Swiss-Prot record:
Keyword Amino-acid biosynthesis among record annotations: no
Gene3D superfamilies xref list: Sodium:dicarboxylate symporter
Name of encoding gene: dctA
Protein's cellular compartments: Cell inner membrane
Keyword Cell inner membrane in record: yes
Keyword line: Cell inner membrane, Cell membrane, Membrane, Symport, Transmembrane, Transmembrane helix, Transport
Organism listed in the record: Burkholderia orbicola (strain MC0-3)
Top-level taxonomy: Bacteria, Pseudomonadati, Pseudomonadota, Betaproteobacteria, Burkholderiales
Protein's recorded name: C4-dicarboxylate transport protein
Chain segments annotated as transmembrane: 9-29, 45-65, 79-99, 149-169, 185-205, 223-243, 308-328, 356-376
Length: 430
């Protein structure tokens, strides 16, 4: 197979687009801010097919299961994994902030902070309780779930639809085959849309730099550096240890999904790479049923980057305003963050809303303290999204191995940079 010229490789194009976007945003901010529709348009094109792809992937995966108990088993294992790893992420964020103390020295009087700029985030945070979140998973109508692009609602519909098809067996084969064919068409659309990723990344990055400016980063560089460093440590050490235990290299895995990571970096939304990630995981030997269940669920329940960010941001505000938190208050913070993070999704800005929800339950720290990081949240959003997508990818491989449905030959070939791999029997064990 003839190797592509480097300038035709997608990730090279995305890197170039990001660099050009940064340059335009820095030197011509007024023009750069007008590039926002390019980024928004690309994300909308991807989100256009996310719902149908999740539905089709989950339905065909479940319909092919001989044992319906497996659906509950996979879901239970995934949720258990999510909670354990999320706890590690929260604790790591807490420990890093205590160790590096990025907020010490600001000496800000909370009374001088104007909370008007974050009022809208606070309102959204107060607008949904745990019960509301759970009830929101149930759609008003099937059409409404797809129209609004609600991932968890679509997942619920797909679980029910797939379960019925599995029960019908051969009588439902025509419907199953149709949905399987539709899945191929949808992924074909994704391949076409993905070619526009450099344009989307350019527009989003140009807008970000043009609107907020590189200068807005300077006063809070220590916080940004602490967050990025902690996220890298989490990926290399925590996820790296999990990957090694499962039998693969985290470095090679990150390299395998580099195109998806660059799309996320450019757009600051992990949803922008969801369909491509699902397809890559299947090609890497994960079973379709596990991919279909774990990845969409992980986008609400396994946001490792958001978890690190939340504990770090809360402690930063406390340090900057000279507020001492007791260990009991910090444990309460962890418990609250564990719950509020479940309401976040892969959309840009969701992390800031969940931060507002967390602060609202910890009254010791003023909600107005969020204005301290409002200007740099957009720059931290990229790191949150990158960590989230790596975390969900690793989770899918782990649960597949746990279920003895990981084709390790495919995984090895994929991580070595191999092309299409012939199917082999799935290997057992972790």
């Amino acid at each position: 197979m003839k190797k592509k010229p480097f300038y035709k490789v997608l990730y090279v194009q995305v890197i170039f687009a990001i660099i050009v976007g940064v340059i335009l945003g820095h030197f011509y901010p007024s023009i750069a801010t007008d590039m926002k529709p390019l980024g928004d348009g690309f994300i909308k094109l991807i989100k256009m097919v996310i719902g149908p792809i999740i539905f089709c992937t989950v339905v065909t995966g479940i319909a092919g299961m001989e044992d319906m108990k497996k659906v509950g088993r996979v879901g239970g294992k995934a949720l258990l994994y999510f909670e354990i790893v999320s706890t590690f992420a929260l604790l790591l964020g807490l420990a890093a902030t205590h160790l590096l103390r990025p907020g010490v020295g600001f000496n800000i009087d909370p009374a001088t902070l104007d909370g008007k700029a974050v009022a809208s985030y606070a309102a959204k945070a107060h607008g949904q309780s745990t019960v509301d979140f759970l009830m929101h998973i149930i759609p008003n109508t099937m059409v409404d779930a797809f129209a609004q692009g609600e991932i968890l609602q679509i997942l619920l519909i797909a679980l029910l639809f797939g379960s019925v098809l599995a029960h019908l067996g051969e009588r439902g084969r025509v419907v199953t085959d149709f949905i399987d064919g539709l899945t191929r068409v949808l992924f074909g659309i994704v391949h076409i849309v993905t070619k526009l990723a450099p344009i989307g990344a350019f527009g989003a990055m140009a807008f970000t730099i043009g609107k907020y400016g590189v200068g807005s980063l300077v006063p809070l560089l220590k916080l940004i550096g602490t967050f990025y460093l902690t996220s890298v440590v989490f990926v290399l050490v925590v996820l790296g240890a999990i990957a090694r235990f499962t039998g693969f290299s985290i470095i090679r895995f990150v390299s395998y999904i580099k195109e998806e990571l660059l799309i996320v970096l450019g757009t600051s939304s992990s949803e922008a790479a969801l369909p491509q990630l699902m397809e890559k995981l299947e090609k890497a030997g994960c079973s379709r049923s596990v991919v279909g269940l774990v990845v969409p669920t992980g986008y609400s329940f396994n946001l490792d980057g958001t978890n690190i960010y939340m504990t770090m941001a809360v402690l930063f505000i406390a340090q900057a305003t000279n507020i001492e938190l007791t260990w009991m208050q910090q444990l309460t913070l962890l418990a609250v963050a564990m719950l509020t993070s479940k309401g976040a999704s892969g959309v840009t800005g969701a992390g800031f809303i969940t931060l507002a929800a967390t602060l609202a339950v910890v009254p010791t720290i003023p909600l107005s303290g969020m204005v301290l990081i409002l200007g740099i949240d957009r720059f931290m959003s990229e790191c949150r999204a990158l960590t989230n997508i790596v975390g969900n990818g690793v989770a899918t491989v782990v649960v597949s191995a746990w279920e003895k449905e990981l084709d390790r030959n495919k995984l090895r070939q994929a991580l070595k940079g191999g092309g299409e791999v012939a199917p082999t029997e799935t290997t057992a064990g972790v």
